[in-house]
Design a protein with these regions (language model features):
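Transmembrane beta-strands of outer-membrane beta-barrel pores
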Residues: 3-9, 18-20, 37-43, 75-81, ...
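Transmembrane beta-strands of outer-membrane beta-barrel proteins
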Residues: 1, 28-37, 52-54, 69-75, ...
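Surface-exposed, polar helix/loop patches in the mature regions of secreted/periplasmic/lumenal proteins
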Residues: 59-104
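Short loop/turn motifs that connect adjacent beta-strands in outer-membrane beta-barrel proteins
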Residues: 21-31, 46, 63-69, 109-112
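Outer-membrane beta-barrel translocator/channel fold
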Residues: 25, 37-51, 73-89
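Outer-membrane beta-barrel "beta-signal"
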Residues: 14, 133-145
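Transmembrane beta-barrel domains of outer membrane proteins
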Residues: 17-19, 23, 57-61, 96, ...
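Solvent-exposed loop/turn segments connecting transmembrane beta-strands
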Residues: 3-13, 42-49, 65, 126-132
């Protein structure tokens, strides 16, 4: 579950993630990956849109950050419908890319809880103009099953 704010909108998101079977220990920390799927509702000043996305993400836990801290980043594909349109911005495509970077922390007896602060950018990658993009600052809570 995550909530976010942008210049022209607010978002509420639900989703699921699945850890990859791959992980690697490097000199400067541990890297793992996961698939993230999400459904969001964006509320803007002129209309509401639904966002569906799938994102592969990499997570880095630096050596010395033993208390569950991590840094994460990913780039995925999204469908936003109807096309995002506010008084200030108008997307020209329904298909968009979404990339994010986050810092977060796992906690709980079994590390089953997690929070993160994320910056996420959506745009069509210059497939068509206009391509103003939208940036969200998001707070995310995850409960691992």
């Amino acid at each position: 579950m995550q909530g976010g704010v942008a210049e022209d909108a607010q978002s509420l998101t639900v989703g699921m993630s699945r850890d990859w079977q791959w992980e690697k220990q490097y000199r400067y920390g541990h890297i793992s990956g996961q698939w993230q799927g999400e459904v969001a509702r964006w509320h803007s000043d002129s209309q509401n849109s639904t966002q569906l996305g799938v994102t592969p993400a990499l997570r880095w836990r630096p050596n010395g950050w033993d208390n569950g801290w991590f840094v994460e980043g990913g780039i995925g594909v999204n469908v936003i419908f109807p096309k995002y349109d506010t008084r200030k911005k108008e997307f020209s495509t329904t298909f968009n890319f979404g990339d994010h970077i986050a810092i977060g922390k796992r906690f709980g007896a079994d590390q089953q809880h997690e929070w993160s602060l994320r910056f996420q950018h959506f745009s069509n990658g210059r497939i068509r103009n206009p391509n103003p993009g939208e940036n969200f600052l998001q707070f995310r809570y995850t409960h691992r099953l």
